[in-house]
From Swiss-Prot:
It comes from Arbacia lixula. GO terms for biological process: ATP synthesis coupled electron transport; electron transport coupled proton transport. The chain crosses the membrane at residues 22-42, 59-79, 95-115, 116-136, 148-168, 191-211, 223-243, 257-277, 282-302, 309-329, 350-370, 433-453. The keyword Metal-binding does not apply. It is found in: Mitochondrion membrane. Keywords: Electron transport, Membrane, Mitochondrion, NAD, Respiratory chain, Translocase, Transmembrane, Transmembrane helix, Transport, Ubiquinone. This is NADH-ubiquinone oxidoreductase chain 4.
């Protein structure tokens, strides 16, 4: 972990001193080296449930850590096109903010101390807010930033209160120590209150349906790198927090509230799928689809089953790659057409046929088509034996496929608008970007052990 943090610090320093002509190549090369260093952890045989008492890398954290480092160079590659014409100071600031977010995510996904986890968890807010308000497309970006900061901050305050109460009760905020002390020295009532305070921050951060109002605004107004990082990684902080703290929750509280929460999450996924069908803004549609997917992730965690939690992690990794690719594809269309309205950008297959291929692949992956995140969807079949109510909502969630097909049908089929006939063709940089999103997806089904939690019992 220290190696990854030092590489991130070196990237920050380099972005200030490298020349203008070499800024993007050097930064992307360094971020690629960061990705390789993270991938090298996969074959580390010393990785177990608890690696040491300050930082940990287990089979729950490792996939999310690798995903964070993998998407950093991809976000920079996607942003290079529209940032090249800005002043060099703005370009350096943008790169530094992306690196700060990556460093905070590395600390978050490798932290055993809950207070360090909370600090790194909240540190991601400030650079993301600056990305939205400074490099957003329209004046509504300030309102989007206001929604983003207030929802996430007010949702995190109860978590801070619960951590303070946890420290005074157990004299420690290290997760292994808390597992031994907290559950044996507190009543079921105090554990229930602590559980209710803790999950609110994660439900807002994911977010599930009902806590999601900040997400569509933030996605629509954010630049492409902000949307990619927000959808692919920052939303996963909520799911990771739920999975990490699930062992500290009261069994009585979980058994009492699991069924209502799982049913609510499944119902929210169904509602957001219907909302997606009514959307005309491409980025808003992808943002609402993220709400639906993360609601299903929360349902898998709340089910407390091995298959449900493994399915949640599998779906988070696959959704991170697919949603990032969809936002990158939406950005390529926006750069050429100047609009995100689906009806106006129709008929793109006649203008950008190679991009149509990537749209087909990613829309199919978004609905769980093999070889993508199908195994994550299969793991959720465990719901059928867990609760009959979940099986009902799971059957109705076939609506998911409708909006994924609608994205491809409306944007790629039909006659082209006349003002789109002279747009530039696709660049090799863009095809490389989409290919690097696809390659990890193809590894999930043949090698699921890279993602599944090995120590979970």
């Amino acid at each position: 972990m220290i190696t990854l943090i030092f590489i991130s610090i070196g990237m920050t320093l380099t972005s200030f001193v490298v020349s203008k002509n070499n800024l993007w190549p050097v930064t992307i090369l360094q971020s690629a080296f960061l990705s390789i260093a993270a991938i090298a952890l996969i074959n580390n045989h010393w990785i177990s449930k608890w690696h040491n008492f300050i930082n940990s890398v287990d089979s729950m954290q490792l996939p999310l850590l690798v995903l964070s480092c993998w998407l950093t160079p991809l976000a920079l590659i996607a942003s290079k096109g529209h940032l090249n014409n800005l002043p060099i100071t703005n370009q350096r600031t943008f790169i530094v903010l992306v690196i700060i977010i990556t460093t905070s995510l590395i600390i978050t996904f490798s932290s055993l101390e809950l207070i360090l986890f909370y600090i790194a968890f909240e540190t991601t807010l400030v650079p993301t807010l600056i990305l939205i308000t400074r490099w957003g497309a329209l004046m509504e970006r300030f309102q989007a930033g206001l929604y983003f900061i207030f929802y996430t901050l007010f949702g995190s305050l109860p978590l801070l209160i619960s951590l303070i109460a946890l420290y005074f009760s157990s004299n420690s905020l290290s997760i292994p120590n808390v597992e031994l002390v907290w559950l044996t020295t507190n009543s079921s009532t105090s554990l229930t209150v602590w559980w209710l305070l803790s999950i609110l921050a994660f439900l807002v951060k994911m977010p599930i349906y009902g806590f999601h109002l900040w997400l569509p605004k933030a996605h629509v107004e954010a630049p492409v790198a902000g949307s990619m990082i927000l959808a692919a990684i920052l939303l996963k902080l909520g799911g990771y927090g739920l999975m990490r703290l699930i062992s500290l929750f009261s069994t009585t509280s979980l058994n009492f509230s699991s069924l209502p929460l799982v049913v609510f999450c499944c119902w929210g996924a169904l509602v957001t799928s219907i909302i997606c069908i009514r959307q005309t803004d491409l980025k808003a549609l992808i943002a609402y689809s993220s709400v639906g997917h993360m609601s299903i992730v929360a349902a898998g965690v709340f089910s407390q089953t091995i298959w449900g939690i493994n399915g949640a992690l599998m779906l988070m990794i696959a959704h991170g790659l697919v949603s990032s690719a969809l936002f990158a594809l939406a950005n390529t269309m926006y750069e050429r057409s100047g609009t995100r309205t689906l009806v106006i950008t129709r008929g793109m297959k006649l203008i950008l046929p190679l991009s149509t291929f990537w749209w087909l692949i990613m829309c199919a992956a978004n609905l769980g088509f093999p070889y993508s995140n199908l195994i994550g969807e299969i793991l959720y079949i465990s719901w059928y034996g867990w609760s009959i109510w979940c099986s009902y909502f799971s059957n109705y969630n076939c609506v998911w496929g409708v909006y994924s097909l609608m994205i491809f049908q409306v944007s790629q089929q039909g006659p082209s608008s006349h003002f789109l006939l002279n747009v530039p063709t696709s660049f090799s940089r863009e095809h490389l970007l989409f290919l690097l999103h696809l390659l990890p997806l193809l590894l999930i089904i043949p090698t699921p052990n890279l993602v599944l939690i090995s120590w979970l019992k």
